[in-house]
Amino acid sequence: MTRFQVSLVSPESLLFSGQVDQVDLPGIEGDLGVLAGHAPIVVMLRPGIVTTVAGDIRDRFVILGGLAEFSQGELTILADSASSVDGFDLTRLKAQIDEMQESLAKQSVGDELDRAVAKFDHFKAIHTALAPATAF
């Protein structure tokens, strides 16, 4: 499989730079897989998981929104905030979700509530994707 260059950058640091086979992105209009030879594209990103695949190696990163551009055989991901899944604080995320849930009950109907619900849903999806599976 042909590889391509990927850079994942946040305001804090360069989190990833390397040759990969595939990248899966959380686009605001749905998840998107990018392979070498993909048509040029610019995508707004929602909070979620970015997965890079190079052979048998998968790296996962949590992002809290951003922008991705694929052109001239390179993918650049500009994340609002990002961290490696390995270094992500799941307890802190759960606390943020609990705070969001409490504040949702106090908000009135309108655009602000719609944005808050969308953010809440994205954070819950991240938590679900990262939390260890539990038996019922």
Curated annotation (Swiss-Prot):
Source domain of life: Bacteria
Full protein name: ATP synthase epsilon chain 2
GO cellular component: plasma membrane; proton-transporting ATP synthase complex
GO molecular function, one term: ATP binding
Quaternary structure and partners: F-type ATPases have 2 components, CF(1) - the catalytic core - and CF(0) - the membrane proton channel. CF(1) has five subunits: alpha(3), beta(3), gamma(1), delta(1), epsilon(1). CF(0) has three main subunits: a, b and c.
The entry's keywords: ATP synthesis, Cell inner membrane, Cell membrane, CF(1), Hydrogen ion transport, Ion transport, Membrane, Transport
CDD domains: F1-ATPase_delta
Similarity field: Belongs to the ATPase epsilon chain family.
Organism of derivation: Nitrobacter hamburgensis (strain DSM 10229 / NCIMB 13809 / X14)
Function field: Produces ATP from ADP in the presence of a proton gradient across the membrane.
Main location (coarse class): membrane
InterPro entries reported for this sequence: ATP_synth_F1_dsu/esu, ATP_synth_F1_dsu/esu_N, ATPsynth_dsu/esu_N
Record's keyword annotation contains Transit peptide: no
Subcellular location: Cell inner membrane
Membrane topology type: Peripheral membrane protein
Gene: atpC2
Annotated Pfam families: ATP-synt_DE_N
Cystine pairings recorded for this chain: none
